[in-house]
Structures are given as C-alpha cells and as structure tokens.
Amino acid sequence: KSGEVLIQVKGAGINNTDINTRLGWYSKKITGETNTVEIESENGSWNGIPISFPRIQGGDVCGNIIQVGEGVDSTRVGERILVRSMQNSPASKNSWAMQTIGSEFDGGFAQFCVAKSNESFPVNCDWSDIELASIPISYSTAEGMLCRADIQKEKILITGASGGVGSAAIQLAKLRGATIIAQCSPDKASALKELGADHTVNRYDDLIQVLGMNSVDAVVD
C-alpha cells in the first residue's frame, strides 16, 4: 500500500510481548490481582481494540526492504532495516494511542512482512540479523524508563535484571554513567556484571535488609 514497504525478514526476536499478547495480558480487564488465564478477553491488544485474526506475531523485526509502495523512495529497496515495534495508531485520534507490530497488524514470524516506510529505520553496522532483532522491544522499553526517570549518574536498582528489558537497562544505564545494582538469581550474577552491573543482589533476599533504607536514587522495575 501507499507509504509501506515489503520486508524480507532476516531475524525476528521472541519475547514476553508475543507471549503476553497470546494470553490477553494487555487487556484492560487484567489487573494486578487478576489471574490472566481465568479471564476470557476479547480486547487483549495494546490499544484495547480486539485483535483480528488470522494474525502473525513477531514484534522484533530485522530484514531487508525488497519492494516499496506508492510514495516511497525506490532507493530504499535493498536497505537493511529495523522496524519500530510500537507505532502511532491510525484507529485513534489521540496522538499517544499506539499499535504494535505482531499484535494489531502482522509481524515478523514469517518470511516477509509489511511495515510503514516511516517506521522502518536503516541500520548500518556489523551486528548479525539475530543480534539486531533482539533490540526493538526490550531496548526501547528500557530506554523509555531511563528517559522518564532522567537517569544519569545516579545509583539505581534494576529488578528482573537478567531478562531482556533488564539486561538492556543495565547497558543503557551504564552508558549514562549510573552505578547499577542488579537483582537476579545467583547463577546469573557474573553474566550481568559482564554487561555492566556494578553490584548484584540475590532476587530472593530482603532488599531493605541487604541494601538498607534510601540506598538507591531510583528503581528500574
């Protein structure tokens, strides 16, 4: 369609967003006290609009543009790109409303997928397609939290630090000069220190007892 590009998928990440979408976890009916599997929800999408089927999941997409739609510069053919996972939703007049690839429209668990040209960004680096496909959702989520808290050189605690978002937050916070305490299982502590964590704490320990009151400037949770 006009303004879109056809992408040959070279790498697609798998993360909790894909699992949570299948469970209906993003439904407005789900709360902190809700057991997801006990709720039958028709509005399990990010924007509250029922997901239409069939649907191809895959929110993290790396690939090459092989065709362009009307209005898209033909020189984009051949570009290696990453697709922005969360995009402005045409179904809403609210500027903050969004749609997510692999949820409201088809994603990257296929040989080919379609995306808006202005949501497909050229990448020029020596990372593999698989490495690049790990970036969009986890790193954008972590970056959003760090920006919202304006993290710079503060001392921070990152919970769930061994997951995709947590490990991304470690690396991004380190680039900002933060001192990082990562909460994780003991067997994952050394790996997180290699990523940039200054200290680790056992996920099963009492944090106040181990760290003390008012011991960090911010918690990235």
Regions found by a protein language model. Name each.
Residues 17-23, 91-92:
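Cytochrome P450 core scaffold surrounding the K-helix E-X-X-R motif
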Residues 1-12, 26-87:
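Glycine-rich beta-strand-centered segment in the early N-terminal region that forms part
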Residues 82, 219-220:
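N-terminal Rossmann-like NAD(P) cofactor-binding module of classical short-chain dehydrogenase/reductase
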Residues 110, 153, 197, 215-217:
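Local beta-strand N-terminus motif with an aromatic residue
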Residues 127-205:
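Mid-domain Rossmann-like dinucleotide-binding core that forms the NAD(H)/NADP(H) cofactor-binding site
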Residues 204-216:
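Short amphipathic alpha-helix with an adjacent loop that forms part of the alpha/beta core around
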